[in-house]
Amino acid sequence: MSFDFTDKLSATVGARYYDVEVDLAGGANATFCNPFFANDQNAFGTNISDLYDGDGSLRFTSDCSTAPRMEAGISFDEAYAIFNELDAYSVDRGKYVNAPNAISEAEIRGYLKALEAPDVAAASGTIWKFTMSYQPSDDVLWYATYSEGFRPGLLNRPGGAQGAGGYEVPFELATDDVTNYELGWKADMAGGTLRFNGSAFFVEIDKLQTTIFDPSIVNLFFSDNAANAEVMGIEGDITWLPQALPGLSIGGAFSLLDTEITDKLIPTNDVREGDSLAFAPEVQFNANARYEWNLSSGLMAHVMGHMAYSDESYSDIITINRDVIDSWTMFGVTAGLASDSWGATLYIDNLTDERAELSRNYVNDRQRATYARPRTVGIRLNFNF
């Protein structure tokens, strides 16, 4: 909804209601207990459909035996007796070794916690957006915005896995929430030949969802609400049409970021307060200059040069999973002809053949990088029918 208080001052209010449920279904198990096309016993793995059905019961899956279902409310001693009757050998081994055919007390306690696993990760609520805008003249607009956002929660396949320091992989993640405060402007200056749009912003991130790979806890990826964080920044774009040289246009854009993890929410040194967020270069900018002129044949010709720069950043907030994404600078040029019905453009992207890193990770203790395309030369043709 929009409200005009005066011809210069207005307000806009928006809201969106969400009711989201995220579920997991299926199985992740071995085939040892399924000889000769027998029914799947869901053994030596996780019966995900059974775990996340919310009925408060769960069948033991670390043995080929036809095990009884355990119900919520059962005590540890009662569960221990059931396991001992089912497979006394494995229970006895669990007192001394950690092996697939050893049932430890920690594993039994994990099954008891799994009895309380939810049916779905549910989230509902309303997010809001408020904007006030003030236009003192036809050439200038100021605005202030408050907005909210969130991502739905998740379910973890290895929920309940135990780590050092009493850490336990959660069965269900909470939403992570964003609150944004922004002050922006749109301005035409120098007789309309210079345009400068931009904004300054502050963002609070609560309960940031993060995917983790830590074999000391479990040999699977899992997610958790790992940290709270803050983002401060300024961004803008500029377009200039010099009056002294008709046909020339110069443009560019920039982004300055200061990101910080303010609180860690999981008991691990793999998340560090004060570190920056992932994929958040402190400085990014691009620029271009294009010159157009009319030929005697009636065609429009142009030449253009452009460049882009990105500062270095981290690929993750989890220190054991992250790598440094190097800074890079890329250049390109184009030249072309156009008429009312067709156009042809010769282009060279990544003129200096920069090995620009667009993404990187260090998951599984192996460096993986995604690079920009190498120097690319081509011709683009377009026709209007």
In which residue ranges do the predicted regions lie?
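Hydrophobic, lipid-facing positions within transmembrane beta-strands of outer-membrane proteins
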Residues: M1, T126-M132, V169, T179-L183, ...
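Membrane-spanning beta-strand positions in outer-membrane beta-barrel proteins
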Residues: S2-D4, K8-G14, V22, T131, ...
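Gram-negative outer-membrane beta-barrel transporters
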Residues: D7-A11, T193-I205, Q209, F222-I318, ...
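Short sequence motifs at beta-strands and strand-loop junctions characteristic
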Residues: E21, P118-T126, A174-D177, A226-M232, ...
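C-terminal beta-signal and adjacent terminal beta-strands/loops
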Residues: E204, M307-I318, G336-F385
